[in-house]
Structures are given as structure tokens and as C-alpha cells.
Regions:
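Conserved ATP-binding/catalytic motifs of P-loop helicase motor domains
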Residues: 1-158
Length: 158
């Protein structure tokens, strides 16, 4: 897939892959661009390369979820072969965005087990995610479920 990236995409691809392989500190990137410029294609390429890297390391469990591919809508999630933010992070679609409702202990433990090994998060179509959804719902759910056990190294918002 890397061969199909343009020069700027390749530069970004290799930069992120280098960071994934060499740094233990969390890093955050926001990648923007108009419709049809290849952001989702870049996500797919980075996902494949990072997954190959993580699974090649000694002692890695192939069944653990290491990378989240998230999007705000089913159509966007389908486009990157990922899942919706709501379904992955157990955020009810009917819930008021301004009020965060923590999960009960059983559901939270299930989510922690499912996402405990996550190292990399891609959030596609970030422009469709409102400030309240991002800061109240996503941020708090990640703090409750993933960040309390092991902080992912990388977040890419596209």
C-alpha cells in the first residue's frame, strides 16, 4: 500500500512509523485536508504497517487489539474497515453529549479487557466530531477504560 501513497503521504507515513517503533512517549497528530486527498487511504496504510510491526515483536498476543480504527459514523467506519466511536467506546447514541455517564463496573471491566493493549488510535473524519463529544465523551471514556491501565502511545486525528 505504501507504493500508492504520494510523496507527502509517504513522508508522513514514515515519520509516524518511525515514532511508533522508536519512542515510548505519547504523541498526537492532527492531519487535515480536503475531501478525496487520501487521508483514509493513509490510515489504511499506517494501520497495516503498524499492525505488522506490533505483531512481529516477540511475545505479542495476536488476539489483543493494539490499534483502534474509529470514525463517528457507520459509513466512515466502514470506509476504513473500523468501528464507530460509539460502539467501540460504549457511548450510547441517545446520551446527552454534555453529561458524561460512566459505565457500571461490569461493562467498564469488559471494555478495559478489550482495549487494555491498545497502543495506537486512529480517529477518521474528526471534523464530524463535535467539541463536546470529543472533550466530554471520548476523552472521559478513554481515561476510564484505556488510560487507567496503559496509555496508548499514539493518537492520529484525520
Amino acid at each position: 500500500m505504501v507504493q500508492t501513497l504520494n510523496q507527502k503521504q509517504k513522508e508522513f507515513f514514515y515519520h509516524i512509523l518511525h515514532l511508533v517503533k522508536t519512542t515510548d512517549k505519547p504523541f498526537y497528530y492532527f492531519l487535515s485536508g480536503g475531501a478525496g486527498v487520501g487521508k483514509s487511504h493513509l490510515i489504511k496504510s499506517l494501520y497495516q504497517a503498524a499492525l505488522k510491526y506490533y505483531n512481529s515483536r516477540a511475545g505479542e498476543d495476536f488476539n489483543e487489539v493494539k490499534i483502534l480504527l474509529l470514525a463517528p459514523t457507520g459509513k466512515a467506519a466502514f470506509g476504513i474497515k473500523g468501528n464507530t466511536i460509539h460502539s467501540t467506546l460504549a457511548i450510547p447514541a441517545s446520551q446527552s453529549l454534555k453529561i458524561y455517564k460512566p459505565l457500571d463496573s461490569n461493562r467498564l471491566n469488559t471494555l478495559r479487557c478489550k482495549l487494555g493493549a491498545v497502543k495506537l488510535i486512529f480517529l477518521d473524519e474528526i471534523s464530524m466530531v463535535g467539541n463536546t463529544m470529543f472533550n466530554v465523551q471520548i476523552n472521559n471514556r478513554l481515561k476510564d477504560s484505556i488510560l487507567s491501565t496503559q496509555m496508548p502511545k499514539t493518537y492520529l486525528f484525520l
